Amino acid sequence: MKKTTLALGMHDKLFKRARTMYQIEHCICDLLMTKGFLRIETPTLEHFEVFSDVVDNGNYNFFDKNGDLISLRPDITSQIGRVIASTQVHTPIKFSYSGKVFNYNEEMRGLSNEHTQAGVEIIGFPVHQALEEAVISAKEALDVAGVRNYKFEFSHAQLLQLIFEELNLPAVKEAELATYIRDKSITGLKEFTKENPSQYDKVLEQLPSLFGETTAVLTEARQLTDNESFLTALDSLEVLTSRLADNLPETTLDLAQLPAVPYYTGIMFKVFGDKVPDAFVSGGRYDKLFERFGATELTAVGWAIDIDSVYQAVHDDVEFGGDMDD
């Protein structure tokens, strides 16, 4: 029976889906190369340490014939960090890429474990320039892919990092707080601040409401703390969204946005659309990634677009003349 069944979380892509996803991927890649991003391809298999210092059960891990622990790549950004640290590549430099990534989801969640991504990494450039180029190139990629009615949502990794550092919680309590933040649990966060008081009590209690139109969220957040580092992070969000106003007249913030990956250190962004429940673009600043590989800190901004999700967003607009439509 297993000869004809798929492994957990894997799917065949047929006809309309296969053709459309191929076209989306190549349109985005061609666009990025014309904008000066150098194409890079990295291996599907890597030593597990490239992605994490400890074995991550969310990754596909196995031992090769030499006894080395190998992972199917869960992301490509970490691999580019390895490339920068281990080769003679000179910075500043801009990369573009596309390829398969793999994340293990439990069977009951019903999620796909294989995705096609395309993305960019902008390394060694002035941070404001890199952030603007990253956001604008992500917008252009969505446009060339035919996505309509999408919105950029921004946050800053340092906001929650400051709170977690101040609280200095044991791992179990840290995970509990992260769950309350992710779920926007008003009751959970209020109870948590009673048990774990800090200078950020007001911020934590209001986090579930600190999302929406950029100016309104910034105004409310600034009234909740006088911590200089926290306010500086808010200022950087205001500066970036103001500089992007001509390209993105409408932006939103979500200050409760937890980093999608652990290496984000600054401004982060996601893109949401009408027809897809989750973000189909995620990106941000990750200056400290290279230190994991023994290299010096570099300014770095990147994003990845999920081609599978983009297909869901444009599916209804794509005509297909074949015998089967998936």
From Swiss-Prot:
Per its UniProt record, what Pfam families does this chain match? Answer: tRNA-synt_His
Q: Name one GO molecular function term.
A: transferase activity
Q: Which UniProt keywords apply?
A: Amino-acid biosynthesis, Cytoplasm, Histidine biosynthesis
S-S pairs: none
Q: Which Gene Ontology BP terms does the record give?
A: histidyl-tRNA aminoacylation; L-histidine biosynthetic process
Question: GO cellular component annotations, sorted alphabetically?
Answer: cytoplasm
- Subcellular localization(s) per the UniProt record: Cytoplasm
Q: In which pathway does it act?
A: Amino-acid biosynthesis; L-histidine biosynthesis; L-histidine from 5-phospho-alpha-D-ribose 1-diphosphate: step 1/9
Q: Which family does it belong to?
A: Belongs to the class-II aminoacyl-tRNA synthetase family. HisZ subfamily.
Q: How does it assemble?
A: Heteromultimer composed of HisG and HisZ subunits.
Role summary: Required for the first step of histidine biosynthesis. May allow the feedback regulation of ATP phosphoribosyltransferase activity by histidine.
Under which name does UniProt file this protein? Answer: ATP phosphoribosyltransferase regulatory subunit
Q: What phylogenetic lineage does the species belong to?
A: Bacteria, Bacillati, Bacillota, Bacilli, Lactobacillales
Q: Which gene encodes it?
A: hisZ
